[in-house]
Amino acid sequence: KEKYATPRRTKIIDAILNYDIEETIQKETVLITVTLQGYIKRGSLKTVKIQKRGGKGKTGITTRNEDSVVQTLSVNTHTSVLFFSTEGLVYKVKAWKIPEGSASSKGKSLFNILPLKNHQSISSIMPFPENDEDSSKYQIVFATSQGKVRKNSLEDFSSINTSGKIAMKLDNNDKIIGVKIWKDCLLYTSPSPR
C-alpha cells in the first residue's frame, strides 16, 4: 500500500439515470389485433406470412366462443394508438405498451390497459401520426348509433392524459359506433331521410 499509495483519479458519484424507456424499444412494424369481446394483443409483423394459392392458412389469434377479430392495425412500436370508446372518450397508448402475444394467444383484456368502466367498450382504434405537425392535415369523423355525425381535426387529440379525454359529448342512450379518418369525400346513407 505504501508503495502504490496514489490517490484515486476517477470520481465515483451517485447519479440518477435520466433516460426515456422508449429509447430502449426497438422500432419495428407490429400488428395490433382487437376482438369483439375486448381482447387486444401486439404481434411482430415478421410472424405473418403470405399464403400461397390453395393454402390452409395459419391461426392469427385464438378467440373464445362467439368472439371475433373486429380490428387490426399495422403500426410502428413507437406510434401512439388512439382508442375511441363507445361512451365518447378517447385514450392514447404507445404501441409498445400493448402486451405482446404469440400467434395462438387470445391477448389481454382492454380493461388491463385502459381505464375503462364496466359498460364501456372500444368502437375504433387508429394510429396517431408520429409528427404532431402531420396531425393537423387529417380530419376524423365520428358516427353515433342515433345517426349523428361529427368532424374533428386529429390535432385535437394530440395531448391526452392517462384517464382519457372527452372526444364527443353524447345524448342519453347514444353510443359511438365508428371513428374513421376523413380524406376528401364522405358518403353516408340512411334508410329513411332525416
Language-model features: where?
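Extracellular/lumenal glycan-associated surfaces
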Residues: 36-37, 85-87, 144-153, 190
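Alpha-helical transmembrane segments and their helix-helix packing motifs
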Residues: 128-148
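Conserved small/polar residues in nucleotide/adenosyl-binding loops
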Residues: 188-194
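Short loop/beta submotifs within extracellular cysteine-rich repeat domains
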Residues: 39-42, 90-91, 148-152, 158-162
